[in-house]
A protein has these predicted regions:
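Exposed, low-structure sequence patches enriched in small/polar residues
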Residues: 21, 116-276
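Outer-membrane beta-barrel channel domains
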Residues: 1-121, 128, 203-220, 225, ...
């Protein structure tokens, strides 16, 4: 994409074929006690147990955010919320600055996880992209559910101008085998995405090694929108917030990592099929 460095963000042309881009991330962390943590930062987030995520991944460039996480019942339950501010790749139509700013949008994510034991984990995900700009009024405040760090509050915005996504994730660990599954749902288009994977830990009794096979698929309308939602795409600066392929695809991947004494090998193989 012109004017964009993939995985980094805004870029300017440098000489004939080069690009000049900057990357800065970090966070401030505050924990009033052992079970509560707050963060103010500029970075990315990832949800799930797989190599990919169909809900929120670290593929898109960094963005400013505020987050809080809370452990309950001897850390068997974790609740986390992330409030962030992102941008579309389109610029504000009329601007007083030499270079028009990108159209802003507000995003928030709520995650409720339960780990009754060290082998099983189950989570519920809720995400929303909120309208923060209007061509007539400029920047506007998003709907009230954006400010509520309560899972389930975004149900109020289904069939609205906001883009709401729900998801479900679970994993089960055996002795050295982990199976996991993730489901993404778009209530506005009745579409879904599915992930299923198996990860073999320490194969051949080699430390720091694994072998992972994963399957991902998403319907072509998973992140579809109507005309009112064009500024609320599930993306940031032209990058998908979830799987890099967005929607309308099937993918199977095999990756692994092996080490022996001073030798080390890591690989990733994948095959994809796009359907629009």
């Amino acid at each position: 994409i012109e004017g964009m460095a993939f995985g980094i963000g805004r870029a300017k042309k440098f000489k004939t074929y080069g690009a000049d881009a900057s990357l800065a991330n970090g966070y401030l962390s505050f924990s009033p006690n052992k079970v509560i943590n707050f963060q103010l930062g500029h970075g990315r987030h990832f949800f799930g147990d797989g190599y990919r995520s169909l809900l929120i991944s670290d593929y898109a460039p960094d963005y400013p955010y505020i987050s809080g996480q809370y452990y309950l019942f001897n850390k068997k339950i974790l609740y986390k919320h992330v409030t962030s501010w992102m941008k579309n790749l389109e610029r504000i139509p009329a601007s007083s600055t030499p270079e028009a700013l990108f159209i802003p949008k507000s995003t928030s994510f709520n995650i409720l996880s339960s780990s009754p034991n060290s082998r099983f984990s189950i989570s519920i995900f809720e995400g929303g992209v909120y309208k923060s700009f209007d061509n007539q009024n400029g920047k506007i405040n998003p709907d009230v559910s954006f400010f509520l760090p309560i899972i389930g509050a975004k149900a109020l915005d289904i069939d609205s101008i906001n883009n709401i996504i729900y998801g479900f994730n679970w994993s089960l660990l055996f002795e050295n085998l982990k199976i996991y599954n993730q489901i993404a749902l778009n209530p506005n288009s009745s579409s879904r995405g599915i992930q299923a994977g198996i990860k073999w830990l320490n194969p051949l009794k080699s430390s720091n090694s694994f072998l992972n096979i994963e399957w991902n698929t998403s319907s072509s309308t998973m992140f579809s929108m109507n005309q009112r939602q064009l500024n609320q795409t599930y993306s940031h600066l032209g990058h998908e917030l979830a799987h890099p392929l967005g929607s309308g695809f099937q993918e199977i991947l095999l990756r692994g990592q092996f080490s022996y004494k001073i030798s080390f090998i890591r690989f990733l193989l994948f095959r994809k099929k796009i359907r629009r």
